[in-house]
Regions:
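The feature encodes the CheY-like receiver
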Residues: 14, 56-57, 88, 106
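Active-site beta3 strand of CheY-like receiver
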Residues: 45-50
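Two-component/phosphorelay signaling modules centered on CheY-like receiver
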Residues: 11-29
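Conserved Asp/Asn-Gly motif in the active-site loop of CheY-like receiver
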Residues: 31-35, 92
Length: 110
């Protein structure tokens, strides 16, 4: 079983993306912001993180920094893909330089 942490503050995104992934056989846990996510990421092993960037409390960039600086080697090395409405090329470059594995711009299709 592949475990995915999906982090987004938009309920519609959480519902539609998690449903699509679960239909394909993935186990998905959802979090509404980075603050919630870091607690979950520190207590359970995930194979992949899908993070929005623009969120309240702790945004995706800050969450990525915390994950990449974690003392937990598995967490620190977890692949992370940004799913974001930030569509400027510079945003993508910054995200990848910060340590994101990939960058997908919203809206996206299955």
């Amino acid at each position: 079983m592949t475990y995915i942490a999906l982090v987004d503050d938009e309920p519609n995104i959480l519902t539609s993306v998690s449903l699509a992934l679960e239909t394909e056989g993935f186990q998905v846990d959802t979090f509404n912001n980075g603050e919630e996510a870091i607690k979950g990421l520190e207590t359970k092993k995930y194979d992949l993180g899908l993070f929005d960037i623009k969120m309240p409390k702790m945004d995706g960039n800050e969450l990525l920094k915390k994950v990449r600086s974690s003392t937990n080697v598995e967490l620190r090395n977890m692949p992370i893909i940004f799913l974001t409405s930030k569509d400027q090329e510079q945003d993508e470059i910054i995200g990848l330089r910060m340590g994101a594995s990939d960058y997908i711009k919203k809206p996206f299709s299955q």
